[in-house]
């Protein structure tokens, strides 16, 4: 079982999420906007390579070219599974990682764009802000549950005017910005993990 400890103060989260958006630059803002629009299209049944590429480009331009190795039928089938409300987090991740070019962090970004109220992006900066560094599918399931618990406690408000206007995505932005704004990246030993996953 994973343990998380929120590093920034809860009272700083909203401001950190706002700073994230201000600092990322116009190109990144456009990529994020397009990614969440593609996620909405997937949620509405448009299971296409173009939508998948748009989301992957937002998180990792260098792996987009791997996506063309997947057949259109495979992409349609896997995106349908991932977008289904009945699919578990584990099932959605396992389906998405069957695609060439999609690893766990990319799969988490795809899910966050499709269902921003349900999922968040697995990112090393956000993990640092929770005092954690490792990740696998089991870890991601617990990470989503912890972030969902924080979001449900209303420690942060949705950024209604931005892509993915949910508490989950605002929290991911805040955690990312907290990590980026630190003077140096520290390694987090296992002894740092003091807070038990409260969402259970």
Where are these regions (language model features)?
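Helix-hairpin-helix/helix-loop-helix acidic hairpins
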Residues: 57-102
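Generic serine detector
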Residues: 11, 41, 60, 71, ...
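Short alpha-helix boundary/capping elements
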Residues: 59-64, 114-119, 179-180
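Catalytic DNA-binding helix-loop module of base-excision-repair DNA glycosylases/AP lyases
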Residues: 91-131
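C-terminal accessory module of base-excision DNA glycosylases/AP lyases that mediates lesion recognition
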Residues: 1-53, 119-200
């Amino acid at each position: 079982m994973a343990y998380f400890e929120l590093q920034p103060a809860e009272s700083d989260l909203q401001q950190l999420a706002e700073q994230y958006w201000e600092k990322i630059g116009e190109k990144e803002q456009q990529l994020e906007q397009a990614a969440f629009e593609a996620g909405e299209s997937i949620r509405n049944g448009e299971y296409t390579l173009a939508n998948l590429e748009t989301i992957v480009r937002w998180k990792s331009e260098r792996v987009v070219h791997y996506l063309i190795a997947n057949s259109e039928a495979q992409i349609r089938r896997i995106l349908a599974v991932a977008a289904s409300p009945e699919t578990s987090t584990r099932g959605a991740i396992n389906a998405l990682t069957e695609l060439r070019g999609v690893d766990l962090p990319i799969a988490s970004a795809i899910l966050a764009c499709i269902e921003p109220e349900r999922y968040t992006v697995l990112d090393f900066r956000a993990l640092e802000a929770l005092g954690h560094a490792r990740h696998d599918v089991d870890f991601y399931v617990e990470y989503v549950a912890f972030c969902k618990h924080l979001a449900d406690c209303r420690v942060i408000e949705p950024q209604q005017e931005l892509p993915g206007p949910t508490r989950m995505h605002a929290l991911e932005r805040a955690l990312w910005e907290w990590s980026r704004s630190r003077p140096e990246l520290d390694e987090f030993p296992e002894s740092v993990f003091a807070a038990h996953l409260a969402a259970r």
